[in-house]
Amino acid sequence: MAAATMALSSPSFAGQAVKLSPSASEISGNGRITMRKAVAKSAPSSSPWYGPDRVKYLGPFSGESPSYLTGEFPGDYGWDTAGLSADPETFAKNRELEVIHCRWAMLGALGCVFPELLARNGVKFGEAVWFKAGSQIFSEGGLDYLGNPSLVHAQSILAIWACQVVLMGAVEGYRIAGGPLGEVVDPLYPGGSFDPLGLAEDPEAFAELKVKEIKNGRLAMFSMFGFFVQAIVTGKGPLENLADHLADPVNNNAWAFATNFVPGK
């Protein structure tokens, strides 16, 4: 069946190509057709984050970008010294991995800091430091969510693992498969139920939000790496390390610990 496309006059699809017929990959073995709306959205030409005149990694001193980095995608600053994006398939895979890891890192960074912040402001936790909290499951009473014994008790590490696999797997499966009706265009930005506030309805605002997401996500991944190193070196949470540094910046900083750090002590 030949694919047919048309331009719709609806304000939300004006000037955009919509695929009407299914491809062979969208027809399952039993002959059932999964209709998937495919809309090609281009980044706004006036945006400083997209296109050949976008912001580069070294500003005016960046030099010429590789030919395959055209500024089509958010977070493209024209820098790829290792050539990781030269192959289109590898680039598509790495782009998806980066976005997903960015989102997990942003959630993880918040989860590392927020309980410690609450604990420092009087909220009672069994253990608020992120890398110590999990060990509470082996205590006599198990692990209470939010430190409240009236909430669900987590007393089995296998049960927690199973719940996480089921819940996370269900969400990821829903995202990748495009929902029960296959209505999602892009598994990275599924919209629909994943956008209850309608933040992606305006194309220009959505394009800018993609850039903000990838920039904050990259920062969050570096933050998580820093939290891991802090946990190994100091044995303290991020806010406690920050408080120590502010109280005595000369003796509590990365250089001081790097020059005095002895593994295992």
Curated annotation (Swiss-Prot):
Residues annotated to bind chlorophyll b 2: 103, 152, 181
Binding, chlorophyll b 4: 164, 175
Subcellular location: Plastid, Chloroplast thylakoid membrane
Entry-linked InterPro entries: Chloro_AB-bd_pln, Chloroa_b-bind
UniProt-recorded Gene Ontology molecular function terms: chlorophyll binding; metal ion binding
Protein's UniProt keywords contain Transmembrane: yes
Binding, chlorophyll a 5: 212, 230
GO biological process: photosynthesis, light harvesting in photosystem I; response to light stimulus
Binding site for chlorophyll b 3: 156, 172
Binding site for chlorophyll a 3: 136, 146, 213
Modification N2-acetylarginine, positions: 36
Known function: The light-harvesting complex (LHC) functions as a light receptor, it captures and delivers excitation energy to photosystems with which it is closely associated.
Family membership: Belongs to the light-harvesting chlorophyll a/b-binding (LHC) protein family.
Oligomer and partners: The LHC complex consists of chlorophyll a-b binding proteins.
Protein name: Chlorophyll a-b binding protein 1B, chloroplastic
Gene: CAB1B
